[in-house]
Swiss-Prot record:
Organism field: Methanococcus maripaludis (strain C6 / ATCC BAA-1332)
Record-listed shikimate binding positions: 19-21, 66, 91, 106, 224
Record lineage: Archaea, Methanobacteriati, Methanobacteriota, Methanomada group, Methanococci
Assembly with partners or alone: Homodimer.
Metabolic or biological pathway: Metabolic intermediate biosynthesis; chorismate biosynthesis; chorismate from D-erythrose 4-phosphate and phosphoenolpyruvate: step 4/7
Pfam families: SDH_C (PF18317), Shikimate_DH (PF01488), Shikimate_dh_N (PF08501)
Active site: 70
Segment forming the signal sequence: none
The protein's name: Shikimate dehydrogenase (NADP(+))
Paired cysteines (S-S): none
Function: Involved in the biosynthesis of the chorismate, which leads to the biosynthesis of aromatic amino acids. Catalyzes the reversible NADPH linked reduction of 3-dehydroshikimate (DHSA) to yield shikimate (SA).
Length: 279
């Protein structure tokens, strides 16, 4: 029940009306019995600069940041976590004692979703499709203990990201780059970090041939609308394990939730809430 002591957390982005974040976070709040509520706010680019001062004035506990504000929000924050600085994007803001602190939980969200299916990720050969904002967070996290190859339509962008990560993580030989027609037979994990295949353009497929994929490989797509994007449907034809973006959404959200509240949410409760909405 909302009262004068209820703490507000939320999501800012544009658009946000189809977001599952309020559903899963409010389910976790109810499950833990804590006095919080989570709302989604559609914020245009021109109004972004007012969000931080407004959130401070209203004593909001914190908020998630989604497309298109993950990079631009950084210039308005008081502090930025070291990993988020290295990634160059923020998806979580905590407000404490009048100070805003930015974090990025996207990479750890993907890692935990993968480990749920594949076990501990160490020394795996991972192929990352895309070199945009999502790719930066995922690549930064997974490159810490694995071997990465980043591919992109624009090979120069893949090269720039791989070199940047190699420098930041001091891993010169384990982060490579290549073209979309790369030989995939030696990869343990393949991850699409691009929006290719996302609603409403659900018939479009990242141009990665999977015919040489090994049977033990895992294919992940960060898209969760639709739940079975065309890239995963293609992977299923080869009998490999597939993971959609729902797990990443839940796990990155769970880390954000703990940053704001100090409480560890039940990810099963969060997943169940989303699944009941989808079905």
């Amino acid at each position: 029940m909302i009262d004068s002591k209820t703490k507000l957390i939320g999501l800012i982005g544009h658009p946000v009306e189809h977001s599952f974040s309020p559903i899963m976070h409010n389910a976790a709040i109810k499950d833990l019995g804590i006095n919080y509520t989570y709302l989604a706010f559609d914020v245009s680019e021109e109004n972004l600069k007012y969000i931080v001062s407004g959130a401070k004035a209203l004593q909001i506990a914190g908020f998630n940041v989604t497309i298109p504000h993950k990079i631009n929000i950084m210039k308005y924050l008081d502090e930025i976590d070291e990993d988020a600085k290295s990634i160059g994007a923020v998806n979580t803001v905590k407000i404490e004692n009048g100070k805003t602190i930015g974090y990025n939980t996207d990479g750890i969200g993907v890692k935990r979703a993968l480990e749920e299916k594949s076990g501990i990720l160490i020394n795996k050969n991972i192929l990352i499709i895309g070199s945009g904002g999502a790719s930066r967070a995922v690549s930064f996290e997974l490159a810490k203990e694995n071997n990465l190859t980043i591919v992109n339509r624009n090979i120069e962008k893949a090269k720039i990201l791989s070199e940047e990560l190699s420098t930041k993580l001091k891993k010169e030989n384990s982060i490579k780059y290549g073209a979309l027609n790369i030989d995939i037979k030696n990869f343990d994990i393949i991850i699409n970090t691009t929006p290719v295949g996302m609603y409403p353009d659900t018939d479009v497929n990242p141009v990665i041939p999977l015919n040489d994929i090994k049977k033990s490989a895992v294919v992940m797509d960060l898209i969760y609308n639709p739940l079975e994007p065309v890239f995963l449907k293609e992977a299923m034809k080869y009998g490999v394990e597939t993971i959609n973006g729902l797990g990443m959404l839940v796990y990155q959200g769970a880390v954000s939730f703990q940053i704001w509240t100090g409480k560890k949410p039940d990810v099963y409760v969060m997943k169940k809430a989303i699944n009941s909405k989808i079905r």
